[in-house]
Amino acid sequence: MKLLHSIKAHDDKVWSLSSHPTLPLLATASTDKCSNIYRLSCSNASSSSSSSSPPSPPSPPSSSSPRRNFPQIAHLEDTHRRSVRSVSFKPPMGGIDHQDSNILDLPALASGSFDSTISIWGIDEPDDDNTYEIEEIIANQKEFLASPGNEWNLMAVIEGHENEIKAVDWNFSGRYLASCSRDKTVWIWETDPETLEEFECVAVLTDHTQDVKHVTWHPTRNLLASSSYDDTIRVYKQEFDDDEWSCVGMIDGHEGTVWCSKFESPKSPKAKDGTTRLVSVSDDLSARVWASKDNTGFNGGSEQLQSQSQTHLPSSIRHNAEEMVWEQESTLPQIHTHAIYSVAWSSSSGKIATAGSDGRIVVYKETNAGWEVENIQESAHGVYEINCVIWAKLDLDQEVLISGGDDGNVNIWEV
């Protein structure tokens, strides 16, 4: 692993990171009650050009402005009274694979806080000032929407949880936002992904018996996993009529707090048709991969994506609240010596990365013989613990690994 860049993002702990699925944007969450947004650009990948200040409004791709290493483009503050614990970018409307390139899809960010609220942030549609035609902006969204010239504004504050929010995550289409809390509940909020004007609570899930640490959506399905201090993972999906959410599986193989879990993307090189896989990490020092066979098809609600690479039964013969049977497929080689706080599963390479309180980052790759260690980065944040690790892509589509730690730094790694 090679350290490409280190950002001194905050003066206090970095709790969470989120990269936008299609734009070169990175968001951070910190104990300092703020979130920052950075552009995922690296000058090492471009030639030098004339020096000038970035124009405003945003410049099109043909601009001769020099590229900077991961410039900060927004500082979101004065909203939360306590730590911002989690951030999550809203995916494009309809999902990454069904994005309409003919509409302007503005980015939005959800931030969950220890003050028990969620804030929603976004940018306004560029004004028609005759500088650029809207068609030009739509055609070059990657440049315009990730520009420092955009002002990020508070769009909504969501209330409902009784205690600290530990995680937030959007579903694949941006229609649903999930949140979890120390109050032992998981909430699902529904909104119009185009306007984000209202957020209606459509489910309060109370299956966990202790603090819920993390929630994560499947990349292409309305399938939600929650991880808890009660040592279990719960899996939820919609009933056939889309009005109810049910717990359809419980994974109880860990012997300590489950801090984080992530679904495998159907795009992963090792993904198999008819099998859903999930990786989880825990206080018990283990990272485990779980698998569930979709023998009777999958009822993921009206938004269920039906990719050509997957086989699903017609909705007319699917069963409501069909139980998912999860089996432990493998335990990754144990490297960590203290609690593992975060795990990320790359949709491009299929690699899994883990990080935690021992300061290590471990990267695993799957072979025909099973999972093996590819990289170990000791003291990735010096003597500090690592709270989050994610896979992301730079603006030139290079995949990187990004970590956030107690030192307030965000480190970008080439793997």
UniProtKB/Swiss-Prot annotation:
Residues 54-63 have a biased composition (Pro residues). Residues 45-70 are annotated as: Disordered. InterPro entries: CIAO1/Cia1 (IPR028608), G-protein_beta_WD-40_rep (IPR020472), WD40/YVTN_repeat-like_dom_sf (IPR015943), WD40_repeat_CS (IPR019775), WD40_repeat_dom_sf (IPR036322), WD40_rpt (IPR001680). Keywords: Cytoplasm, Nucleus, Repeat, WD repeat. One of its GO terms (cellular component) is cytosolic [4Fe-4S] assembly targeting complex. One of its GO terms (biological process) is tRNA wobble uridine modification. It holds the Pfam family WD40. PROSITE patterns: WD_REPEATS_1 (PS00678), WD_REPEATS_2 (PS50082), WD_REPEATS_REGION (PS50294). Signal peptide: none annotated. It is found in: Cytoplasm; Nucleus. WD repeats lie at residues 9-48, 79-131, 160-200, 207-246, 253-300, 335-374, 380-415. Essential component of the cytosolic iron-sulfur (Fe/S) protein assembly machinery. Required for the maturation of extramitochondrial Fe/S proteins. Interacts with NAR1. Belongs to the WD repeat CIA1 family. HAMAP family: ciao1 (MF_03037). This is Probable cytosolic iron-sulfur protein assembly protein 1. It comes from Lodderomyces elongisporus (strain ATCC 11503 / CBS 2605 / JCM 1781 / NBRC 1676 / NRRL YB-4239). The gene is CIA1.
